[in-house]
């Protein structure tokens, strides 16, 4: 049975006494109800950025259930709170579930960006980059390593550009999409020609990612091509073009 919708807002900005009550109650809530609660909170969180379900997510990212962990990471990353960087690094490197590791690696992207614009302590920034590079160069599942590459797109570390080039030239559409995502995250015009040439790729998700990257990099010369892509047969491509 789901939590009554009218009570869901009460999970936002919990007072200390309410947080303590939640900590005591959490183990008694069935895994299915925990997932249902977090799905509802995620929906609310997306609709209203004034809400904060940090206290619930703090429990969720310590949970034993992969889906609970996944939703906890998804919501918590939106708040960009540096105190959870260590948790995200630990999950990205050590959680037993690949989807959780991938989500946590992706969550580190925002902090990589914050470090680049001097809003994190340099040692913290380096720790994040080191963790992501370690994941990228590991034998982990492709999805986890690809999320690490995308997060590293924000980084100016010298190891990053060769890694993007390698993924771009891999011939694997998934790695190509991640390379384009990283290029967009870098906002570096050096990637301009490599992005534009992918507007005509046979794979629609590649075309969509290339369109998004063109917007991130602000490639003015790509505008005529992007306008033509508004007639693309694929909805994802058209949506990406409209965003760009």
Give a label for each model feature.
Residues 37, 41, 107-113, 155-157:
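Hydrophobic residues within the alpha-helices of tandem HEAT/HEAT-like
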Residues 31-35, 66-67, 82, 98-99, ...:
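Alpha-helix N-cap/helix-start positions at coil->helix boundaries
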Residues 14-26, 47-62, 81-93, 114-137, ...:
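Amphipathic alpha-helical scaffolding segments comprising HEAT/armadillo-like alpha-solenoid repeats
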Residues 8-9, 23-27, 38-42, 57-58, ...:
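Amphipathic alpha-helical repeat scaffolds
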Residues 6, 29-32, 36, 48, ...:
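Residues within HEAT/ARM-like alpha-solenoid scaffolds
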Residues 1-49:
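N-terminal alpha-helical scaffold/docking segments in eukaryotic complex subunits
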């Amino acid at each position: 049975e789901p939590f009554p919708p009218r009570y869901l807002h009460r999970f936002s900005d919990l007072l200390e006494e309410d947080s303590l009550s939640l900590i005591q109650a959490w183990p008694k809530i069935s895994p299915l109800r925990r997932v249902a609660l977090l799905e509802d909170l995620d929906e609310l969180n997306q609709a209203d950025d004034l809400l904060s379900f940090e206290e619930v997510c703090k429990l969720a990212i310590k949970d034993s259930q992969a889906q609970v962990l996944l939703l906890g990471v998804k919501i918590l990353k939106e708040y960009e709170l540096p105190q959870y960087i260590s948790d995200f690094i630990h999950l990205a490197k050590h959680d037993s579930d690949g989807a959780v590791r991938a989500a946590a690696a992706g969550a580190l992207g925002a902090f990589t960006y914050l470090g680049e614009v001097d809003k994190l302590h340099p040692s913290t920034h380096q720790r994040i980059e080191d963790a992501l590079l370690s994941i990228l160069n590991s034998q982990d599942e492709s999805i986890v390593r690809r999320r690490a590459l995308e997060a590293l797109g924000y980084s100016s570390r010298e190891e990053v550009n060769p890694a993007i080039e390698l993924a771009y030239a891999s011939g694997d559409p998934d790695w190509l999409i991640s390379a384009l995502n990283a290029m967009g995250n870098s906002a570096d015009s050096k990637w301009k020609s490599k992005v534009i040439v992918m507007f005509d790729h046979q794979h629609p998700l590649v075309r969509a990612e290339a369109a998004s990257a063109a917007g991130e990099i602000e490639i003015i010369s790509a505008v005529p091509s992007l306008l033509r892509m508004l007639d693309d047969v694929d909805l994802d491509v058209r949506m990406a073009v409209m965003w760009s």
